[in-house]
Amino acid sequence: MQAAQSLYENGYITYMRTDSTNLSEQAVSAARSQITSLYGPDYVPEKVRTYATKSRGAQEAHEAIRPAGESFRTPEGLARELDGDRARVYELIWQRTVASQMKDANGLRTNIRFEADAGERGTAVFTTSGKVITFPGFLRAYVEGSDDPDAERGDQERLLPPLSQGQQLPVES
């Protein structure tokens, strides 16, 4: 909370003691403009995205926590001004604000079954499942949990490369 307080006091973010999910028109415009310049117009949805607060006792007198100003400074643009926790907190706020105004990601869930001749032992069968991202959408700006090095690998989705039936694959042991 000290890092966020410092960011607020120095004009980097808006008021941070709020539960609000609402962004001002100015913030939405800044986010959409930045999305277009960083990722291209294909990442901006036609309609502004709005979100409802899920908690009954939410403190919504202020708008959502976001980068301050009429245009947002990127975390990279502030690298020389912010250090340690302040840089990480700002990056998280920036990522979530920008991602909140981007199109959804699209992908295909895939189940793959590999069969290989195992000689005298018959056929070896291997299976895996995962997803292939066909359009990254908001994932270009923010992936939930990607900054958690201790996350259980088994709990994370695996990204699979595009494959075609009959394609030969290298085997590694």
Regions found by a protein language model. Give the residues of each.
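Long, highly charged, low-complexity internal segments
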Residues: 1, 40-41, 54, 74, ...
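Extended, well-ordered alpha-helical scaffold/bundle regions in very large, multi-domain proteins
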Residues: 1-59, 65
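An acidic- and aromatic-residue-enriched active-site/binding cleft used to recognize and process polar
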Residues: 5-6, 12-13, 18-20, 70, ...
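Short hinge/gating elements
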Residues: 13-20, 64-81, 171-173
